[in-house]
């Protein structure tokens, strides 16, 4: 007969009113392997091989790798980004505010000024992969929304724009490590000429490009026409290496004359352009390289020289403007749209500052796409950047680890009678500047609308292997494209032209899609909070990533603190969003928990999620282990607040490890459901003197409670860890003390998942809220009783206990540097526990 839920509760000694025998007899029984096996069979916990098909969905939970279909919103608003500029002299400003900084604060702030990123190897992808075809039905809409988002980021100074292989431009205030290029005089339509100080080799190159190339090095004859340059990499004097992409239709932006002329006054340039804008875009920046045969040049115009237009008008190099002088091919021809505007604005925009960068190919290293900003805000979009190449494969980067506060540390730290508020740092990641040397590794961009459409539309034919150039301009015209562009024209106007050109952007601030970013953000905010705490010693400031909380004794005090801290953060260049400041009163909502003076509990929305999960949980049906991962993720978050804690979930963990389906028996489901119906707060640990000690040998146990000594023996010898755990349980139940001294590291760690299942569950309940102090065996007063000697008294130790806040130390204390001697217990082991000797 299967084990009923009532019997199971009695077995686990969870019912207070049951007439169980003395704990010293009952508990060792739960460690019995035979009993554990029988219960597992009864509850159907061990039966991992099932023949029935697996269930792949429970409520909202699907397998870990099944993708929920994302929904594209044509109405998405691109969020606005403030001009974020973290001041370079942040260390000096902090020192003016609080006096000299500690070594750790300095080290952390230097780490992000500027941040550096050196991956082992970088894989370059073609520009076509720049914008991911994430929404196949909304390709054009998604393309323009994403391009607009990228343009917004560039305008806000968050991205660099690659101008040439060795130069980039950006908007906003420059940092000292960004080496600006010297500009030549720009008057009228004179070309922009970069002459970087260190890039040019031995001989100096003349002040302007135009003068050098009066006789064309490329051998372009006037009658050959501009499109003869579709294979510029084949010419003799340019090394093939100098052009990273010969197939990418980046020709020379041509003019009608024979020499390569960078002025904007030749008639073949985009017609009908206003003279005002003419100077802004028509010139080209080029990077100069020395080749063995003299001066070689590399040209990159960002205009795809796609096709010679069919009509007899002048030839444009710009795909968009070529439509202007063509005969419409149908009522859905793009020429109708292009003729709507006289002035389509520049083909290319340049930033306010031009800097030199390491050699950057015309490629991307990650794709981008848009999603909802968050589940509660679907009106705004968020850019997702996929730099997962750096976390994969043999060359993956092992990201630095950093301390995340665990539940007990957090409670010890924040459970107090303070009044709280939390600050919202807007676009926190985009505060931290990246060194330009990282740019070649973090490239995003797009190949331009013509190629994007050509690649995705079925009717366009790329003929004769023409290096990706469209043979016929009108091949890309279609009703769908025309309708989409007409609608987008209402939103973006002349920018449609700008966004239809190819672009390559590199990150100037840390991106979210790289494992380095969370580490850097955590270092940054923890150092800032450390400074704030020292400036206001009677208050508490704490942060986890971009979540910053301030606590003060009274509401008035908190408000004045808020004003002072906000002004300080603004003076450093940190942007706060005042509309999102939340005042919590005396119970703080932080990291998914509610923390008050009584302790910590999970937030209400998590409790509701758990209830919903149990309502949907099927009984006697095998559930896919990937779905079990999701269920365990949710239940594991709230496990410390239940009677039996993590040990109760061990059968689920076991099935996930074995990659087998798990079947919930009615009793096990009822047991878990009951566990999560009553949640108990996790209280903060108090410091005190340890008066109660426990010790055990495989055959017996001993306790020292004050001046009293007790001992007992086990019916059969037990593993030493199990024996020590039983002794600790006896000490707690006999003395009621919340502070127990033990010499066993596993008991100290309070992780009872490696014990026999039934014992782990019960011990977790008995020892809930107990703090342990390490006492060396030689000094343990309970050592003699456990060996059966009651006569000899060792003096009682005065063992003070101080609760720890783990490695999330308040004053950013750096962890001690480990010696290079091998550690006896490996760090990944559950047995390892960080204790400081008394």
Curated annotation (Swiss-Prot):
One of its GO terms (biological process) is symbiont-mediated suppression of host innate immune response. It comes from the Viruses. Its EC number is 2.7.7.7, 2.7.7.49, 3.1.26.4. InterPro entries: DNA/RNA_pol_sf, DNApol_viral_C, DNApol_viral_N, HBV_DPOL, Rev_trsase/Diguanyl_cyclase, RT_dom, Viral_Replic_Matur_Polypro. Residues 1-179 are annotated as: Terminal protein domain (TP). Residues 342-685 are annotated as: Polymerase/reverse transcriptase domain (RT). Multifunctional enzyme that converts the viral RNA genome into dsDNA in viral cytoplasmic capsids. This enzyme displays a DNA polymerase activity that can copy either DNA or RNA templates, and a ribonuclease H (RNase H) activity that cleaves the RNA strand of RNA-DNA heteroduplexes in a partially processive 3'- to 5'-endonucleasic mode. Neo-synthesized pregenomic RNA (pgRNA) are encapsidated together with the P protein, and reverse-transcribed inside the nucleocapsid. Activated by host HSP70 and HSP40 in vitro to be able to bind the epsilon loop of the pgRNA. Because deletion of the RNase H region renders the protein partly chaperone-independent, the chaperones may be needed indirectly to relieve occlusion of the RNA-binding site by this domain. Inhibited by several reverse-transcriptase inhibitors: Lamivudine, Adefovir and Entecavir. Terminal protein domain (TP) is hepadnavirus-specific. Spacer domain is highly variable and separates the TP and RT domains. Polymerase/reverse-transcriptase domain (RT) and ribonuclease H domain (RH) are similar to retrovirus reverse transcriptase/RNase H. The polymerase/reverse transcriptase (RT) and ribonuclease H (RH) domains are structured in five subdomains: finger, palm, thumb, connection and RNase H. Within the palm subdomain, the 'primer grip' region is thought to be involved in the positioning of the primer terminus for accommodating the incoming nucleotide. The RH domain stabilizes the association of RT with primer-template. The gene is P. One of its GO terms (molecular function) is RNA-directed DNA polymerase activity. Keywords: DNA replication, DNA-binding, DNA-directed DNA polymerase, Endonuclease, Host-virus interaction, Hydrolase, Inhibition of host innate immune response by virus, Inhibition of host RLR pathway by virus, Magnesium, Metal-binding, Multifunctional enzyme, Nuclease, Nucleotidyltransferase, RNA-directed DNA polymerase, Transferase, Viral immunoevasion. Pfam families: DNA_pol_viral_C, DNA_pol_viral_N, RVT_1. The record marks 65 as: Priming of reverse-transcription by covalently linking the first nucleotide of the (-)DNA. This is Protein P. It catalyses: DNA(n) + a 2'-deoxyribonucleoside 5'-triphosphate = DNA(n+1) + diphosphate; Endonucleolytic cleavage to 5'-phosphomonoester. SUPFAM superfamilies: DNA/RNA polymerases (SSF56672). Residues 352-595 form the Reverse transcriptase domain. Belongs to the hepadnaviridae P protein family. Residues 180-341 are annotated as: Spacer.
């Amino acid at each position: 007969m299967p084990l009923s839920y009532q019997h199971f509760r009695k077995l686990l000694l969870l019912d207070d009113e049951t007439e169980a025998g003395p704990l010293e007899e009952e508990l060792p029984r739960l460690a019995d392997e035979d009993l554990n096996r029988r219960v597992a069979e009864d509850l159907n916990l061990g039966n991992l091989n099932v023949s029935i098909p697996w269930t792949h969905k429970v409520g909202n939970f699907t397998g870990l790798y099944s993708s929920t279909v994302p929904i594209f919103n044509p109405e998405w608003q691109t969020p606005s980004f403030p001009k974020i500029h973290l001041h370079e002299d942040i260390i000096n400003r902090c020192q003016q505010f609080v006096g000299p900084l500690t070594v750790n604060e300095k080290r952390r702030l230097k780490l992000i000024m500027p941040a550096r990123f050196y991956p082992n190897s970088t894989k370059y992808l073609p520009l076509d992969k720049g914008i991911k075809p994430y929404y196949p039905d909304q390709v054009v809409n998604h393309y323009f929304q994403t391009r607009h988002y990228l343009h917004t980021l560039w305008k806000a100074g968050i991205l660099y724009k690659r101008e040439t292989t060795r130069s980039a431009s950006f908007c906003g205030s420059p940092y000292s490590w960004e080496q600006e290029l010297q500009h030549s005089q720009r008057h009228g339509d004179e070309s922009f000429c970069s002459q970087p100080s260190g890039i040019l080799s031995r001989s100096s190159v003349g002040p302007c490009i135009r003068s050098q190339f009066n006789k064309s090095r490329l051998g372009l004859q006037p009658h050959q026409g501009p499109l003869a340059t579709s294979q510029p990499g084949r010419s003799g004097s340019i090394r093939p290496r100098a052009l990273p992409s010969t197939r990418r239709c980046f020709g020379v932006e041509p003019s009608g004359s024979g020499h390569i002329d960078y002025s904007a006054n030749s008639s073949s340039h985009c017609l009908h352009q206003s003279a005002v804008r003419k100077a802004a875009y028509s010139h080209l920046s080029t990077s100069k390289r020395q080749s063995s045969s003299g001066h070689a040049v590399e040209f990159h115009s960002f205009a795809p020289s796609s096709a010679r237009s069919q009509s007899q008008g002048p030839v444009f190099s710009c795909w968009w403007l070529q439509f202007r002088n063509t005969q419409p091919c149908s009522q859905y021809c793009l020429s109708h749209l292009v003729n709507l505007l006289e002035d389509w604005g520049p083909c290319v925009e340049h930033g306010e500052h031009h800097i030199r960068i390491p050699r950057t190919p015309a490629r991307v290293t990650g794709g981008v796409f848009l999603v909802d900003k968050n589940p509660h805000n679907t009106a705004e979009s968020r850019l997702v950047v996929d730099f997962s190449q750096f976390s994969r494969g043999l060359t993956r980067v092992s990201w630095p680890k950093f301390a995340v506060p665990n539940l007990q540390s957090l409670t010890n730290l924040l459970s107090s009678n303070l009044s709280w508020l939390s600050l919202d740092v807007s676009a926190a990641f985009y505060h931290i500047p990246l060194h330009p040397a990282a740019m070649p590794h973090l490239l995003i961009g797009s190949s331009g609308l013509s190629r994007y459409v050509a690649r995705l539309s079925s009717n366009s034919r790329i003929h004769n292997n023409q290096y990706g150039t469209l043979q016929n301009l009108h091949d890309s015209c279609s009703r769908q494209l025309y309708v989409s562009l007409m609608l987008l024209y209402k939103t973006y106007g002349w920018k449609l032209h700008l966004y239809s050109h190819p672009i390559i952007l590199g990150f100037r601030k840390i991106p979210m899609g790289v494992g380095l970013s969370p580490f850097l953000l955590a270092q940054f905010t923890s150092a800032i909070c450390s400074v704030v705490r020292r400036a206001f010693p009677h208050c508490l400031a704490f942060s986890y990533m971009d979540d910053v909380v301030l606590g003060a004794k009274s509401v008035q005090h908190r408000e004045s603190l808020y004003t002072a801290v906000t002004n300080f953060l603004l003076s450093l260049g940190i942007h706060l969003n005042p509309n999102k400041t939340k005042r919590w009163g005396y119970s703080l909502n932080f990291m998914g928990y509610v923390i008050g003076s009584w302790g910590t509990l999970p937030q209400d929305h998590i409790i509701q999620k758990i209830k919903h999960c149990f309502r949907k949980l099927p009984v006697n049906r095998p559930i896919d282990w990937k779905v079990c991962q999701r269920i365990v993720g949710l239940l594991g978050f709230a496990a410390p607040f239940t009677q039996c804690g993590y040990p109760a979930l061990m059968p689920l963990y076991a099935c996930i490890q074995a990659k087998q389906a798990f079947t919930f028996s009615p009793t096990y489901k009822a047991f878990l459901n009951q566990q999560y119906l009553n949640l108990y707060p996790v209280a903060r640990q108090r410091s005190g003197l340890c008066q109660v000690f426990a010790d055990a040998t495989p055959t017996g146990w001993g306790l020292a409670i004050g001046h009293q000594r007790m001992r007992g023996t086990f019916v059969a010898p037990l593993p030493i860890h199990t024996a020590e755990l039983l002794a600790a349980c006896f000490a707690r139940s006999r003395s009621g003390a919340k502070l127990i001294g033990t010499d066993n590291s596993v008991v100290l760690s309070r992780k009872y998942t490696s014990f026999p299942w039934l014992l782990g569950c019960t011990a977790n309940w008995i020892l809930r809220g107990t703090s342990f102090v390490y006492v060396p065996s030689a000094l343990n007063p309970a050592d003699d009783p456990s060996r059966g000697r009651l006569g000899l008294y060792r003096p009682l130790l005065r063992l003070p206990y101080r609760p720890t806040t783990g490695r999330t130390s308040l004053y950013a204390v750096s962890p001690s540097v480990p010696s290079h001697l091998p550690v006896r217990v490996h760090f990944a082991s559950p047995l390892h526990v960080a204790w400081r000797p008394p």
